[in-house]
């Protein structure tokens, strides 16, 4: 794989890490990992909100001046099984703090494991992939960490590379449907689109922009400032990212985002720092 395409894929993989607090999947990349190669990406993320969009989309402060913040530490891994298949896994840990709650909460949340199948490619420039993911809660009797329900997701992604303003570029589009299997378990449509651009001929520095969101539907319409617990909501988020590659095996990425609009969700501001390692 050419260095440019390789680093574009890495940038897309890590630039969306900041979305962990709304449980957006890490495994959206469309460019394949070589057979026998292992990708490891630890990250630290931050989420903050002190206002919300209500069920009609009207923005207002949290009651009684409440504030919610969350710090997450996540390990993402991806292993190339063959030219067509890859194994992916995500293990997140969060520390949640709502100012009006009696005490913060922390712990492992939902383990995600999946298989990605590369359906086809066009001249090794454009790639189509399909991924199935299983969601397994790693906690019990702690509603502040998530739904506590098993689930499954099916996601389709389309990725490609090219040139813009004389510089190498790439894009990725992904859309997935996720179902949780418990009481009032929501069904969700999760989507994102990313465009990235290299800033130099050696592919050492890159920037990207991303639009992402979730539409979640459930009979449970209640709202909580803790976003992992809401079941019926929607939001659209914009983010920018910067990546620096020290080598083909080691890269560092920064990203930040802002929720633009939503329903029954907090008005979130996000940031993340991620390290990419390949063996």
Region spans (language model):
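Outer-membrane beta-barrel biogenesis signature
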Residues: 22-59, 64-65
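Outer-membrane pore/translocation modules
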Residues: 95-188, 230
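Detector for outer-membrane/organellar transmembrane beta-barrel domains
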Residues: 36-38, 43-44, 48, 147-225, ...
């Amino acid at each position: 794989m050419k260095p440019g395409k390789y680093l574009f894929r890495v940038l897309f993989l890590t630039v969306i890490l900041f979305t962990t607090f709304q449980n957006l999947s890490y495994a959206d990349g469309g460019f394949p990992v070589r057979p026998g190669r292992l990708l490891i990406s630890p990250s630290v993320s931050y989420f903050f909100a002190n206002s919300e969009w209500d069920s009609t989309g009207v923005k207002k402060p949290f009651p009684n001046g409440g504030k919610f913040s969350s710090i997450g530490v996540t390990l993402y891994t991806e292993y190339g099984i063959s030219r067509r298949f890859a194994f992916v896994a995500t293990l997140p840990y969060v520390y949640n703090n709502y100012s009006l709650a009696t005490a913060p909460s922390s712990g492992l949340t939902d383990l995600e494991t999946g298989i990605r199948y590369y359906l086809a490619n066009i001249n090794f420039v454009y790639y189509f992939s399909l991924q199935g993911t299983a969601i397994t809660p790693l906690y019990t009797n702690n509603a502040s960490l998530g739904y506590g329900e098993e689930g499954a997701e099916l996601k389709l992604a389309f990725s490609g590379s090219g040139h813009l303003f004389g510089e190498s570029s790439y894009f990725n589009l992904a859309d997935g449907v996720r179902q949780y299997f418990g009481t009032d378990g929501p069904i969700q449509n999760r989507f994102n689109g990313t465009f990235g651009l290299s800033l130099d001929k050696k592919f050492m520095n890159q920037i990207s922009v991303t639009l992402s969101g979730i539409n979640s539907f459930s009979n449970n319409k209640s709202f909580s400032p803790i976003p992992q617990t809401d079941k019926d909501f929607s939001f659209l988020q914009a983010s920018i990212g910067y990546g620096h590659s020290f080598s083909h095996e080691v890269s560092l990425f920064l990203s930040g985002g802002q929720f633009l609009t939503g329903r029954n969700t907090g008005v979130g501001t996000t940031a993340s720092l991620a390290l990419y390692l390949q063996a």
